[in-house]
Amino acid sequence: MNVKYRESITRINDKEKEVKSKNILELKEVNNMLHIEKINGKNVWEILKLHVSESQKEFVAANDVSIIEAYATITASGFAFPFGIYDNKTPVGFMMIGYDSADYWEDAPDIARGNYSLWRLMIDENYQKKGFGREAVALGLDFIKSFPCGKSEYCWLSYEPENEVARQLYRSYGFIETGDMVSGEIIAVLKL
């Protein structure tokens, strides 16, 4: 393990304790109607209709691309969990969780091996600024902490350097930037 990576992990462990108690209190005040549902033949079309604003398209792949990536990953014996994000029965966003990197991702960062990732998160432009993104991260982390692919030490994600909204959202959950990049995006890690 290189020194820079080890230092990042130490910062993650320290920050995690500080953030956990804050987020537990805040989540108790959030509307509990938001939930996630696995993408299936019944809901895929309504999820494909969701999109971010024109100015946000550089920050997140379209849902059709994400669902194709999930399919390609799963058929290559990898792990991808695509979900619709719902407020009651209304679709408001999309999330995808990944695990490991196996043979299907040639240029995977070291942190991907044996760890979970919050691979995609988007909230439709019509449902933003309502706290859904923040609550969706909590739902995603709850799913990850059920360890559907087995135990893991970390959850990681990446975002464009210009995406300050994502940076602040993930930082509020204790994700710490490692200083590493993948495909031009900043990698941030959370100890589970």
Task: Kindly give the residue locations of the regions a language model identified.
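Terminal substrate-recognition subdomain of acyl/acetyltransferases
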Residues: 12, 27, 176, 181-192
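Acetyl-CoA-dependent GNAT
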Residues: 34, 38-119, 124-126, 143, ...
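Conserved acetyl-CoA pyrophosphate-binding loop and the N-cap/start of the following alpha-helix
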Residues: 127, 131-139
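Conserved beta-strand-loop-alpha-helix junction that forms the acyl-donor binding cleft
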Residues: 151-167, 183-186
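Conserved active-site alpha-helix within GNAT-family acetyltransferase domains
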Residues: 134, 161-179
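Conserved N-terminal entry element of GNAT/NAT acetyltransferase domains
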Residues: 9, 16-45, 49-50, 192
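Active-site acidic-Proline motif in GNAT/NAT acetyltransferases
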Residues: 124-126, 130, 161-162
